[in-house]
């Protein structure tokens, strides 16, 4: 929006051309989202408290979590508002990728909002029934996958790129739609599973978004893409602005979500942020890198799958409790220790993911 206005004003004052620089708009988008979240936070928390929209806590979980009962939830709404407003302000609204990632993010956010609303407002512990949750997730995920498949400008945009190898490009054909669906839906649910401790999910999300911003910037730049031997995806550079708004909004939310949390993001935030990371990774053709950088999300998801599978097959549990962060809590780790160590792991994994840009 502001880019369009700047282009008009540039006819009268050339200084406005500075807003055509992508790096500047990434920075401004990040700062705008950060400030919006910091401004919205107290107001959102106050309204959630007034309406008694508080987190319910399971009796069979770690005893330390009982004190969290009643903490305002659904705070992810402020993250989505900050992301949407900042992206619309600083992004190039003629770029179809911008509209696609916003649609996917807000669509998954709507699913999470309905789930949260039924749980905390209507006092229905099941929330949105699983079959309907996965139906709508699948509808949005497949819709995005088909759209990307039909609008691909070159074969490489629907191929699997293998990191560390310059020339390993695997044509996917229609399987691209299946892979894209699983990346978006899987990433969404993985972040949701990780969102169980104060600040545990949001900081890794911020870090991964920052990593993807670098990939998006490079993928949309002809010189960088050729030099780094990564796919050139025309228009993907604008996703760096979107990723910047995720990082900014996430840091703003962390101001209130850090231990001890004043607010939780709820499914409205977790499902949306996970889907956002997934769809960006798909567009810039870095699904495998997302798997690396989002290793904490992967560990949490795999721990649940192993726990459920082991219990059904043998009647025994592998972990004291799943997802994995609860296992460490029940081993006696204080909550802040679990959180910060998972953050440290994510920093290392994001750096490893970025290293694949050069090691080829």
Curated annotation (Swiss-Prot):
Transmembrane regions listed in the UniProt entry: 21-41, 73-93, 94-114, 145-165, 168-188, 199-219, 236-256, 263-283, 288-308, 339-359
Gene Ontology molecular function: any one: metal ion binding
Matching InterPro entries: Glycosyl_transferase_4, PNAcMuramoyl-5peptid_Trfase, PNAcMuramoyl-5peptid_Trfase_CS
EC number: 2.7.8.13
Protein's pathway: Cell wall biogenesis; peptidoglycan biosynthesis
Gene Ontology biological-process annotations: cell division; cell wall organization; peptidoglycan biosynthetic process; regulation of cell shape
Record localization: Cell inner membrane
KW DNA repair (keyword) present: no
EC category name: transferase
GO cellular component assignments: plasma membrane
Catalysed reactions, semicolon-separated: UDP-N-acetyl-alpha-D-muramoyl-L-alanyl-gamma-D-glutamyl-meso-2,6-diaminopimeloyl-D-alanyl-D-alanine + di-trans,octa-cis-undecaprenyl phosphate = di-trans,octa-cis-undecaprenyl diphospho-N-acetyl-alpha-D-muramoyl-L-alanyl-D-glutamyl-meso-2,6-diaminopimeloyl-D-alanyl-D-alanine + UMP
Membrane topology: Multi-pass membrane protein
Keyword annotations of the record: Cell cycle, Cell division, Cell inner membrane, Cell membrane, Cell shape, Cell wall biogenesis/degradation, Magnesium, Membrane, Metal-binding, Peptidoglycan synthesis, Transferase, Transmembrane, Transmembrane helix
Domain of life: Bacteria
Predominant location: membrane
Cofactor: Mg(2+)
PANTHER family for this protein: PHOSPHO-N-ACETYLMURAMOYL-PENTAPEPTIDE-TRANSFERASE, PHOSPHO-N-ACETYLMURAMOYL-PENTAPEPTIDE-TRANSFERASE HOMOLOG
Protein family (similarity comment): Belongs to the glycosyltransferase 4 family. MraY subfamily.
Function: Catalyzes the initial step of the lipid cycle reactions in the biosynthesis of the cell wall peptidoglycan: transfers peptidoglycan precursor phospho-MurNAc-pentapeptide from UDP-MurNAc-pentapeptide onto the lipid carrier undecaprenyl phosphate, yielding undecaprenyl-pyrophosphoryl-MurNAc-pentapeptide, known as lipid I.
HAMAP family (UniProt xref): MraY
Protein's name according to its UniProt entry: Phospho-N-acetylmuramoyl-pentapeptide-transferase
Organism listed in the record: Chromohalobacter salexigens (strain ATCC BAA-138 / DSM 3043 / CIP 106854 / NCIMB 13768 / 1H11)
Lineage, opening ranks: Bacteria, Pseudomonadati, Pseudomonadota, Gammaproteobacteria, Oceanospirillales
């Amino acid at each position: 929006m502001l880019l369009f206005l700047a282009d008009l004003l540039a006819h009268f004052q050339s200084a406005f051309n500075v807003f055509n620089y992508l790096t500047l708009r990434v920075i401004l988008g990040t700062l705008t989202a950060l400030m919006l979240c910091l401004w919205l936070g107290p107001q959102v928390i106050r309204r959630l408290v007034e309406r008694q929209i508080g987190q319910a806590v399971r009796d069979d979980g770690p005893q330390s979590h009982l004190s969290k009962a009643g903490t305002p939830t659904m705070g992810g709404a402020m993250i989505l508002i900050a992301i949407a407003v900042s992206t619309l302000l600083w992004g190039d609204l003629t770029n179809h990728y911008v509209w696609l990632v916003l649609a996917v993010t807000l669509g998954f956010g709507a699913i999470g909002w309905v789930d949260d609303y039924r749980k905390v407002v209507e006092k229905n512990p099941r929330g949105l029934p699983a079959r309907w949750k996965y139906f709508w997730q699948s509808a949005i995920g497949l819709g995005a996958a088909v759209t990307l498949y039909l609008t691909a400008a070159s074969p490489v945009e629907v191929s699997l790129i293998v990191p560390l190898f310059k020339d390993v490009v695997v044509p996917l054909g229609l399987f691209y739609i299946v892979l894209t669906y699983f990346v978006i839906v899987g990433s969404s649910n993985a972040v949701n599973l990780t969102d169980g401790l104060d600040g545990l999910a949001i900081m890794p999300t911020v870090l991964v978004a920052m990593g993807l911003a670098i990939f998006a910037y490079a993928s949309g730049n002809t010189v960088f893409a050729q030099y780094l031997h990564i796919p050139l995806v025309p228009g993907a550079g604008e996703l760096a602005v979107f990723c910047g708004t995720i990082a900014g909004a996430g840091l703003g939310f962390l101001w209130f979500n850090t231990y001890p949390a004043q607010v939780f993001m709820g499914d409205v935030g977790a499902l949306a942020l996970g889907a956002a990371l997934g769809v960006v990774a798909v567009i810039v053709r870095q699904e495998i890198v997302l798997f690396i950088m989002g290793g904490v999300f992967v560990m949490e998801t795999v721990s649940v799958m192993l726990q459920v599978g082991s219990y059904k097959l043998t009647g025994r549990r592998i972990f004291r409790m799943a997802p994995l962060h609860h296992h460490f809590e029940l081993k006696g780790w204080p909550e802040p220790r679990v959180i910060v160590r998972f953050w440290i792991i994510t920093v290392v994994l994001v750096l490893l993911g970025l290293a694949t840009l050069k090691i080829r």
